[in-house]
Amino acid sequence: MLISIIVPIYNVQEYLSQCLDSLEGQLDTNMEVILVNDGATDNSLAICEEYAQKHSNTIIINKENGGLSDARNAGTMVAQGNYIYYLDSDDWLAPDAILTLYDYAVKNSCEIVQGGFYYAYEDYLLYDNSIKTAQVLNREEAMLELIKNESVKDFSWGKLYRADIVKKHIFPKGKYFEDSYWQHIVVHDCAHYGIVPTPLYYYRQRSTGISGTFSLKSLDLVQGYEERLEFIKGYYSNYIAEMVLSLWDTFYSLMSVANKQEDYKKAFEDYWEVLNEKYGSLFEKYLSSDLRFRIRKTYPSILPLYDFILRIKSRIKSSNLVKISLK
Protein backbone atom coordinates (compact mmCIF):
# COMPACT_ATOMS: atom_id res chain seq x y z
CA MET A 1 0.00 0.00 0.00
CA LEU A 2 1.47 3.34 -1.07
CA ILE A 3 -0.77 6.05 0.40
CA SER A 4 -3.38 6.27 3.16
CA ILE A 5 -5.73 9.27 3.01
CA ILE A 6 -7.21 10.01 6.43
CA VAL A 7 -10.41 12.06 6.67
CA PRO A 8 -11.60 12.96 10.22
CA ILE A 9 -15.36 13.56 10.18
CA TYR A 10 -17.73 15.26 12.61
CA ASN A 11 -21.08 16.81 11.61
CA VAL A 12 -20.05 18.02 8.16
CA GLN A 13 -22.91 16.64 6.06
CA GLU A 14 -23.11 19.93 4.18
CA TYR A 15 -19.54 19.62 2.87
CA LEU A 16 -18.60 15.95 3.05
CA SER A 17 -19.78 14.86 -0.39
CA GLN A 18 -17.70 17.56 -2.08
CA CYS A 19 -14.69 16.45 -0.05
CA LEU A 20 -15.06 12.78 -0.97
CA ASP A 21 -15.98 13.49 -4.59
CA SER A 22 -12.69 15.35 -4.98
CA LEU A 23 -10.89 12.03 -4.48
CA GLU A 24 -12.51 10.57 -7.60
CA GLY A 25 -10.07 9.96 -10.40
CA GLN A 26 -6.94 10.13 -8.26
CA LEU A 27 -7.26 6.87 -6.36
CA ASP A 28 -5.87 3.52 -7.45
CA THR A 29 -5.48 0.08 -5.89
CA ASN A 30 -2.36 1.21 -4.04
CA MET A 31 -4.29 3.79 -2.02
CA GLU A 32 -6.77 3.56 0.83
CA VAL A 33 -9.23 6.09 2.20
CA ILE A 34 -9.80 6.00 5.95
CA LEU A 35 -12.97 7.80 7.02
CA VAL A 36 -12.97 8.41 10.77
CA ASN A 37 -16.50 9.07 12.01
CA ASP A 38 -15.80 10.95 15.23
CA GLY A 39 -19.24 10.44 16.75
CA ALA A 40 -21.11 12.51 14.15
CA THR A 41 -24.78 13.09 14.96
CA ASP A 42 -25.88 14.30 11.52
CA ASN A 43 -26.02 12.44 8.19
CA SER A 44 -22.23 12.20 7.82
CA LEU A 45 -22.05 8.45 8.53
CA ALA A 46 -24.65 7.67 5.85
CA ILE A 47 -22.60 9.67 3.33
CA CYS A 48 -19.51 7.70 4.35
CA GLU A 49 -21.30 4.38 3.98
CA GLU A 50 -22.60 5.31 0.53
CA TYR A 51 -19.08 6.26 -0.53
CA ALA A 52 -17.60 3.03 0.86
CA GLN A 53 -20.12 0.93 -1.08
CA LYS A 54 -18.74 2.39 -4.30
CA HIS A 55 -15.06 2.24 -3.33
CA SER A 56 -13.67 -1.02 -1.98
CA ASN A 57 -10.47 0.64 -0.79
CA THR A 58 -12.39 2.60 1.86
CA ILE A 59 -12.29 1.92 5.59
CA ILE A 60 -14.80 3.45 8.01
CA ILE A 61 -13.86 3.84 11.66
CA ASN A 62 -16.71 4.64 14.05
CA LYS A 63 -15.69 6.07 17.42
CA GLU A 64 -16.94 8.27 20.21
CA ASN A 65 -16.34 11.96 19.74
CA GLY A 66 -12.80 12.81 20.81
CA GLY A 67 -11.95 15.78 18.65
CA LEU A 68 -9.87 16.29 15.52
CA SER A 69 -6.57 15.10 17.01
CA ASP A 70 -8.09 11.90 18.37
CA ALA A 71 -9.74 11.17 15.02
CA ARG A 72 -6.48 11.68 13.14
CA ASN A 73 -4.70 9.40 15.60
CA ALA A 74 -7.33 6.69 15.15
CA GLY A 75 -6.87 6.77 11.39
CA THR A 76 -3.09 6.86 11.63
CA MET A 77 -2.98 3.76 13.85
CA VAL A 78 -4.71 1.57 11.24
CA ALA A 79 -3.15 3.13 8.13
CA GLN A 80 -1.33 0.64 5.90
CA GLY A 81 0.25 3.11 3.49
CA ASN A 82 3.91 4.03 3.25
CA TYR A 83 2.72 7.64 3.15
CA ILE A 84 -0.13 9.37 4.98
CA TYR A 85 -2.19 12.36 3.88
CA TYR A 86 -4.62 14.27 6.12
CA LEU A 87 -7.68 15.77 4.44
CA ASP A 88 -10.13 17.74 6.57
CA SER A 89 -13.72 16.82 5.80
CA ASP A 90 -14.95 20.33 4.97
CA ASP A 91 -12.14 20.90 2.46
CA TRP A 92 -11.48 19.36 -0.94
CA LEU A 93 -8.68 18.57 -3.38
CA ALA A 94 -7.61 19.52 -6.87
CA PRO A 95 -7.36 16.68 -9.42
CA ASP A 96 -4.11 14.68 -9.11
CA ALA A 97 -3.23 16.40 -5.81
CA ILE A 98 -2.14 13.18 -4.11
CA LEU A 99 -0.04 11.81 -6.97
CA THR A 100 1.59 15.20 -7.56
CA LEU A 101 2.91 15.21 -3.99
CA TYR A 102 3.80 11.52 -4.09
CA ASP A 103 5.81 11.85 -7.31
CA TYR A 104 7.71 14.80 -5.86
CA ALA A 105 8.40 12.91 -2.62
CA VAL A 106 9.82 9.90 -4.45
CA LYS A 107 11.84 11.92 -6.95
CA ASN A 108 13.44 14.07 -4.23
CA SER A 109 13.58 11.56 -1.33
CA CYS A 110 11.33 13.78 0.81
CA GLU A 111 9.83 12.60 4.08
CA ILE A 112 7.26 15.41 3.93
CA VAL A 113 5.91 17.30 0.93
CA GLN A 114 3.68 20.36 1.33
CA GLY A 115 1.38 21.46 -1.47
CA GLY A 116 0.07 24.91 -2.24
CA PHE A 117 -3.50 25.74 -1.30
CA TYR A 118 -6.40 28.10 -1.85
CA TYR A 119 -8.29 29.94 0.84
CA ALA A 120 -11.72 28.94 -0.45
CA TYR A 121 -14.49 31.45 0.19
CA GLU A 122 -18.03 31.13 -1.13
CA ASP A 123 -17.51 33.52 -4.03
CA TYR A 124 -13.75 33.58 -4.55
CA LEU A 125 -10.40 31.94 -3.90
CA LEU A 126 -7.24 33.49 -2.48
CA TYR A 127 -3.80 32.13 -3.29
CA ASP A 128 -0.44 33.20 -1.90
CA ASN A 129 1.93 33.07 -4.84
CA SER A 130 5.02 34.19 -2.92
CA ILE A 131 6.64 30.79 -3.51
CA LYS A 132 7.37 30.63 -7.23
CA THR A 133 9.14 27.30 -7.69
CA ALA A 134 9.24 23.88 -6.08
CA GLN A 135 12.04 23.40 -3.57
CA VAL A 136 13.54 21.00 -1.07
CA LEU A 137 14.64 22.25 2.36
CA ASN A 138 16.91 20.48 4.79
CA ARG A 139 15.89 19.99 8.42
CA GLU A 140 17.34 23.26 9.71
CA GLU A 141 15.92 25.33 6.84
CA ALA A 142 12.49 23.75 7.24
CA MET A 143 12.45 24.35 11.00
CA LEU A 144 13.28 28.03 10.61
CA GLU A 145 10.59 28.47 7.97
CA LEU A 146 8.09 26.71 10.24
CA ILE A 147 8.94 28.95 13.18
CA LYS A 148 8.37 32.00 11.01
CA ASN A 149 5.31 30.35 9.39
CA GLU A 150 6.53 31.41 5.99
CA SER A 151 7.24 28.84 3.28
CA VAL A 152 6.66 25.94 5.72
CA LYS A 153 3.10 26.27 6.98
CA ASP A 154 2.00 25.42 10.50
CA PHE A 155 -0.79 23.01 9.60
CA SER A 156 -1.09 19.25 9.13
CA TRP A 157 -3.57 19.01 6.27
CA GLY A 158 -2.50 19.16 2.65
CA LYS A 159 0.88 17.54 3.24
CA LEU A 160 2.12 14.07 2.36
CA TYR A 161 4.04 12.44 5.23
CA ARG A 162 6.13 9.31 5.32
CA ALA A 163 4.10 7.03 7.56
CA ASP A 164 6.92 5.86 9.82
CA ILE A 165 7.45 9.46 10.96
CA VAL A 166 3.87 10.38 11.84
CA LYS A 167 3.17 7.03 13.48
CA LYS A 168 5.83 7.87 16.07
CA HIS A 169 4.22 11.16 17.05
CA ILE A 170 0.52 11.24 17.96
CA PHE A 171 -1.51 14.44 17.96
CA PRO A 172 -2.31 15.86 21.43
CA LYS A 173 -5.87 14.90 22.33
CA GLY A 174 -8.26 17.63 23.44
CA LYS A 175 -6.21 20.56 22.21
CA TYR A 176 -7.32 23.27 19.84
CA PHE A 177 -4.63 24.33 17.36
CA GLU A 178 -3.15 20.84 17.68
CA ASP A 179 -0.68 21.51 14.87
CA SER A 180 1.28 23.93 17.04
CA TYR A 181 2.15 21.02 19.35
CA TRP A 182 2.99 18.60 16.54
CA GLN A 183 4.48 20.17 13.43
CA HIS A 184 7.92 20.99 14.84
CA ILE A 185 8.31 17.41 16.08
CA VAL A 186 7.69 15.80 12.69
CA VAL A 187 9.76 18.44 10.87
CA HIS A 188 12.62 17.58 13.23
CA ASP A 189 12.40 13.98 11.97
CA CYS A 190 12.53 15.13 8.35
CA ALA A 191 15.83 15.36 6.45
CA HIS A 192 14.20 16.59 3.23
CA TYR A 193 11.07 18.79 3.27
CA GLY A 194 9.56 19.36 -0.16
CA ILE A 195 7.39 22.29 -1.17
CA VAL A 196 5.23 22.19 -4.30
CA PRO A 197 3.70 25.66 -4.73
CA THR A 198 0.95 24.54 -7.12
CA PRO A 199 -2.41 24.99 -5.30
CA LEU A 200 -3.69 21.46 -4.71
CA TYR A 201 -5.91 21.93 -1.64
CA TYR A 202 -9.04 24.01 -1.10
CA TYR A 203 -9.11 25.25 2.50
CA ARG A 204 -12.71 26.22 3.17
CA GLN A 205 -13.26 29.52 4.98
CA ARG A 206 -16.42 29.53 7.06
CA SER A 207 -18.43 32.73 7.45
CA THR A 208 -17.78 32.97 11.21
CA GLY A 209 -14.86 35.30 11.87
CA ILE A 210 -12.25 35.02 14.60
CA SER A 211 -14.40 36.95 17.07
CA GLY A 212 -17.17 34.41 16.67
CA THR A 213 -14.90 31.41 17.29
CA PHE A 214 -12.70 33.01 19.92
CA SER A 215 -12.62 31.46 23.41
CA LEU A 216 -10.24 30.65 26.22
CA LYS A 217 -9.30 27.54 24.22
CA SER A 218 -7.47 29.95 21.92
CA LEU A 219 -4.76 29.91 24.57
CA ASP A 220 -4.02 26.34 23.45
CA LEU A 221 -2.19 27.92 20.53
CA VAL A 222 0.01 29.95 22.87
CA GLN A 223 0.70 26.90 25.01
CA GLY A 224 1.61 24.92 21.92
CA TYR A 225 4.14 27.59 21.03
CA GLU A 226 5.47 27.50 24.58
CA GLU A 227 6.17 23.79 24.09
CA ARG A 228 7.75 24.60 20.75
CA LEU A 229 9.99 27.22 22.34
CA GLU A 230 11.26 24.67 24.85
CA PHE A 231 11.91 22.26 21.97
CA ILE A 232 13.79 24.91 20.01
CA LYS A 233 15.88 25.78 23.07
CA GLY A 234 16.92 22.13 23.25
CA TYR A 235 17.62 21.40 19.58
CA TYR A 236 17.90 24.64 17.59
CA SER A 237 19.45 27.24 19.88
CA ASN A 238 20.31 29.45 16.90
CA TYR A 239 16.57 29.95 16.33
CA ILE A 240 15.54 30.98 19.84
CA ALA A 241 15.17 34.63 18.84
CA GLU A 242 12.80 33.76 15.99
CA MET A 243 10.77 31.43 18.22
CA VAL A 244 10.46 34.02 20.99
CA LEU A 245 9.17 36.49 18.41
CA SER A 246 6.71 33.90 17.09
CA LEU A 247 5.38 33.24 20.60
CA TRP A 248 5.05 36.95 21.29
CA ASP A 249 3.38 37.64 17.93
CA THR A 250 0.87 34.88 18.54
CA PHE A 251 -0.05 36.00 22.04
CA TYR A 252 -0.22 39.64 21.00
CA SER A 253 -2.61 38.85 18.13
CA LEU A 254 -4.91 36.88 20.42
CA MET A 255 -4.68 39.52 23.13
CA SER A 256 -5.81 42.14 20.62
CA VAL A 257 -9.00 40.15 20.07
CA ALA A 258 -9.48 39.41 23.78
CA ASN A 259 -9.25 43.10 24.65
CA LYS A 260 -12.47 43.66 22.70
CA GLN A 261 -14.36 40.93 24.57
CA GLU A 262 -15.03 41.48 28.25
CA ASP A 263 -15.52 37.75 28.86
CA TYR A 264 -11.90 37.04 28.01
CA LYS A 265 -9.96 40.24 28.60
CA LYS A 266 -8.97 39.55 32.21
CA ALA A 267 -8.05 35.92 31.52
CA PHE A 268 -5.63 37.01 28.83
CA GLU A 269 -4.22 39.77 31.01
CA ASP A 270 -3.61 37.16 33.70
CA TYR A 271 -1.97 34.84 31.20
CA TRP A 272 0.32 37.63 30.09
CA GLU A 273 1.60 37.74 33.67
CA VAL A 274 2.24 33.99 33.52
CA LEU A 275 4.11 34.34 30.23
CA ASN A 276 6.12 37.26 31.49
CA GLU A 277 7.12 35.33 34.60
CA LYS A 278 8.25 32.33 32.55
CA TYR A 279 9.88 34.11 29.63
CA GLY A 280 10.39 37.69 30.73
CA SER A 281 14.17 37.46 30.46
CA LEU A 282 13.91 36.03 26.93
CA PHE A 283 11.42 38.72 25.94
CA GLU A 284 13.77 41.41 27.21
CA LYS A 285 16.72 39.83 25.42
CA TYR A 286 15.12 39.19 22.03
CA LEU A 287 12.27 41.71 21.81
CA SER A 288 14.05 44.88 22.86
CA SER A 289 13.57 46.34 19.37
CA ASP A 290 9.94 45.19 19.01
CA LEU A 291 7.79 48.30 19.31
CA ARG A 292 4.67 46.43 20.40
CA PHE A 293 6.53 44.84 23.29
CA ARG A 294 7.97 48.17 24.43
CA ILE A 295 4.55 49.85 24.21
CA ARG A 296 2.89 47.07 26.18
CA LYS A 297 5.45 47.42 28.97
CA THR A 298 5.61 51.22 29.03
CA TYR A 299 2.50 52.80 27.46
CA PRO A 300 -0.22 50.12 27.29
CA SER A 301 -2.97 52.73 26.89
CA ILE A 302 -1.87 53.56 23.32
CA LEU A 303 -1.90 49.94 22.12
CA PRO A 304 -5.32 50.34 20.39
CA LEU A 305 -3.87 53.07 18.17
CA TYR A 306 -0.89 50.93 17.31
CA ASP A 307 -3.21 47.99 16.56
CA PHE A 308 -5.07 50.20 14.10
CA ILE A 309 -1.82 50.96 12.28
CA LEU A 310 -0.96 47.25 12.19
CA ARG A 311 -4.35 46.42 10.65
CA ILE A 312 -3.68 48.88 7.85
CA LYS A 313 -0.29 47.30 7.22
CA SER A 314 -1.91 43.86 7.27
CA ARG A 315 -4.37 44.89 4.56
CA ILE A 316 -1.49 46.10 2.43
CA LYS A 317 0.33 42.80 2.89
CA SER A 318 -2.79 40.76 2.10
CA SER A 319 -3.17 42.67 -1.15
CA ASN A 320 -0.30 40.52 -2.46
CA LEU A 321 -2.66 37.52 -2.47
CA VAL A 322 -4.03 36.50 -5.86
CA LYS A 323 -7.83 36.64 -5.91
CA ILE A 324 -9.80 34.37 -8.23
CA SER A 325 -13.52 35.09 -8.60
CA LEU A 326 -15.87 32.11 -8.71
CA LYS A 327 -18.79 34.06 -10.20
For the regions a language model picked out, list residue spans one by one.
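A conserved acidic beta->alpha catalytic loop
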Residues: 22, 37-47, 64
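Donor-binding/catalytic cores of nucleotide-activated saccharide
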Residues: 68-69, 89-194, 204-215
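Short beta-strand/loop segment that forms part of the nucleotide-sugar
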Residues: 30-39, 59-64, 88-89
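Catalytic core of nucleotide-sugar-dependent glycosyltransferases
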Residues: 200-206, 213-240, 253-280
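Membrane-interface aromatic/basic loop that binds lipid-linked glycans or pyrophosphate carriers
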Residues: 261-327
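Short, acidic, metal-binding catalytic loop of nucleotide-sugar glycosyltransferases
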Residues: 21-30
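Glycine-rich, basic loop-to-helix element that forms the pyrophosphate-binding segment
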Residues: 63-79
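Short aromatic/hydrophobic "clamp" motif used to bind/position activated sugar donors
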Residues: 84
